[in-house]
Amino acid sequence: MSFAAAQATYVLHSRPYKETSALVDFFTPLGRLRAVLRGARGKAGALARPFVPLEAEWRGRGELKTVARLESAGIPNLLNGQALFSGLYLNELLIRLLPAEDPQPEIFAHYAATLPLLAAGRPIEPLLRAFEWRLLEQLGYGFALDVDIDGRPIEPQALYQLLPEAGLEPVAQLQPGLFQGSELLSMADADWSAPGALAAAKRLMRQALAPHLGGRPLVSRELFMNRKESPRD
């Protein structure tokens, strides 16, 4: 995969590297890549922040590349409060789930469209659920919400459990972690006004993502929970 030509990109994460450089995880339509940004204390370092539309060129054939050029390509998406933690959550999902240098133009486009909506104060939960669902689908982990694992239509009054590698399985007895058929059908229609639909979608996405996150907790989620629990002045 060649990254020599200029590419639209976003910074997912950056950390200091050696004396004046930074090690940066970028997300482009051609995939996720890691590169050394030299002179990170100067203008380039000021640009290399999450949620800022950028254009970049890279050098190098190995997994670790070098940033050859980095320029602003649009208005920064200024995220604050819960929107900021949500943006960090999306970035962490991309770092944890995307294979390196695997082209994902659809995910990139969805990400680029989601950031301005977060910055504009749009309701956060529907945005996160839509992004999680698109990510699962594009990576080949998606499943149907309107039919069960045997191809039968989801029944509104029935109960279902998620088998992450297969789909939704009907169950006869009540147990933890189940989903009402009516909730699943609301998710299929993206009808977030239906009672319980958003809460059920959050549980469903957690169950669907968990096998692919390797058992390690999400740092962004822990940061958000710590913020909620911190006493306020």
UniProtKB/Swiss-Prot annotation:
Claim: rRNA-binding is one of the keywords in the record: no
Recorded superkingdom: Bacteria
Assigned keywords, A-Z: DNA damage, DNA recombination, DNA repair
GO cellular component: bacterial nucleoid
InterPro entries found in the cross-reference section: ARFGAP/RecO (IPR037278), DNA_rep/recomb_RecO_N (IPR022572), NA-bd_OB-fold (IPR012340), RecO (IPR003717), RecO_C (IPR042242)
Keyword Secreted: no
GO biological process: DNA recombination; double-strand break repair
Family of this protein: Belongs to the RecO family.
HAMAP family noted in UniProt: RecO (MF_00201)
Protein role: Involved in DNA repair and RecF pathway recombination.
Record NCBIfam families: reco (TIGR00613)
Family matches, as PANTHER family: DNA REPAIR PROTEIN RECO (PTHR33991:SF1)
Protein's name according to its UniProt entry: DNA repair protein RecO
Gene giving rise to this polypeptide: recO
